């Protein structure tokens, strides 16, 4: 899919995770298109708190789903999240840290606070 999509720094979008494989297109990147109604553009570092929050909202990211080759997520995994779900978690003070260079610029259509926050996960993972 990579038609040279950009990250929030207007640079080429970097890989979020290939283990587990993430992204709307399961390319490892938070690429998007008009088909991606959920806007899976935020590369985030999973936490126990966020995974439980998502589960309580009806999106079980913890349990494995073998028929979709989904191993289930655990704290420390990186995953392309829907921008709206990340924003909901942010408003509840439990948003996971983002990986800016792997977060699609289209996330900024929904999450303007990303323009103003520092990104501790980038520092820890580089």
Where would I find each of the regions flagged by the language model?
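A charge-rich, low-complexity, intrinsically flexible signal that marks solvent-exposed coils, linkers
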Residues: 2-74, 85-93, 99-112, 118
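Single conserved hydrophobic/aromatic residue that forms the stacking wall/gate
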Residues: 116-126
């Amino acid at each position: 899919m990579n038609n040279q999509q950009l990250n929030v720094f207007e640079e080429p979008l970097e890989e979020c995770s290939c283990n587990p494989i993430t992204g709307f297109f399961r390319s490892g990147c938070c690429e998007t298109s008009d088909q991606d109604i959920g806007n899976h553009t935020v590369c985030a570092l999973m936490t126990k708190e966020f995974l439980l929050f998502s589960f309580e909202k009806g999106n079980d990211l913890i349990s494995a789903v073998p028929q979709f080759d989904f191993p289930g997520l655990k704290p420390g995994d990186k995953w392309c999240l829907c921008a709206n779900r990340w924003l909901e978690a942010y408003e509840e003070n439990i948003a996971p840290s983002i990986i800016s260079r792997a977060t699609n610029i289209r996330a900024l259509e929904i999450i303007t606070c990303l323009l103003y926050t520092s990104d501790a996960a980038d520092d820890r993972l580089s």
